[in-house]
């Protein structure tokens, strides 16, 4: 429901409330030869995102990069991160980057606009949006997809 408030005595402004963020989930599978010591795992970053939105839900502020908090499941060789990022108008400016622990060597970079164009089942026009990204290292190649758990196979019964 819209909230109506007085801007001045003779004016009323209606503001529609809507979700101001996207949920981002990144999983990295088959990380190449990570060391056994702490701090040797690759790091995930989300680059070029808006740091805030104004009261009318418009992205604002200077584009910012965030280092994501990750969890590593050694038995599955699975690195995951979950974050909320502000809604932004231009997906082209946003990248998900996977770097060596030192932060110097870039292992993978995924442009959000390209990823969303290749995966139209992710609908960023909805109120609650989950953007799931799977980065898989396999046989010397890197494959970027939507995780299988996100794609729901529907078989209608007639």
What does each model-found stretch correspond to?
Residues 124-158:
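Hydrophobic, glycine-enriched assembly/anchoring segments
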Residues 1-20:
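Short, low-hydrophobicity acidic/polar segments
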Residues 36-120, 158:
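Tryptophan-paired
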Residues 6-10, 115-119, 126:
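Solvent-exposed, conformationally flexible loop/turn segments
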Residues 15, 26, 44, 96-98, ...:
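Hydrophobic beta-strand residues in large extracellular and virion-surface proteins
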Residues 18-32:
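A short, Gly/Thr-enriched small/hydrophobic beta-strand-prone motif that recurs across taxa
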Residues 11, 32-33:
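Compact mixed alphabeta submodule
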Residues 10-12, 23-25, 78-80:
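Intrinsic-disorder/low-complexity, polar/charged segments enriched in Ser/Thr/Lys/Arg/Asp/Glu/Gln
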């Amino acid at each position: 429901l819209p909230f109506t408030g007085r801007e001045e005595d003779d004016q009323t402004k209606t503001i529609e409330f809507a979700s101001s963020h996207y949920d981002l989930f990144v999983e990295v599978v088959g990380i190449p030869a990570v060391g056994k010591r702490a701090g040797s795992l690759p790091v995930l970053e989300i680059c070029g995102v808006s740091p805030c939105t104004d009261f009318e839900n418009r992205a604002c502020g200077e584009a910012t990069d965030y280092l994501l908090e990750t969890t590593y499941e050694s038995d599955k060789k699975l690195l995951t991160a979950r974050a909320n990022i502000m809604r932004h108008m231009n997906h082209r400016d946003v990248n998900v980057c996977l770097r060596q622990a030192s932060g110097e060597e870039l292992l993978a970079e995924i442009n959000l606009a390209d990823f969303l164009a290749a995966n139209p089942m992710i609908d960023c026009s909805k109120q609650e949006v989950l953007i799931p990204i799977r980065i898989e290292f396999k046989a010397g190649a890197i494959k970027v997809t939507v995780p299988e758990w996100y794609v729901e196979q529907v078989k209608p019964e007639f």
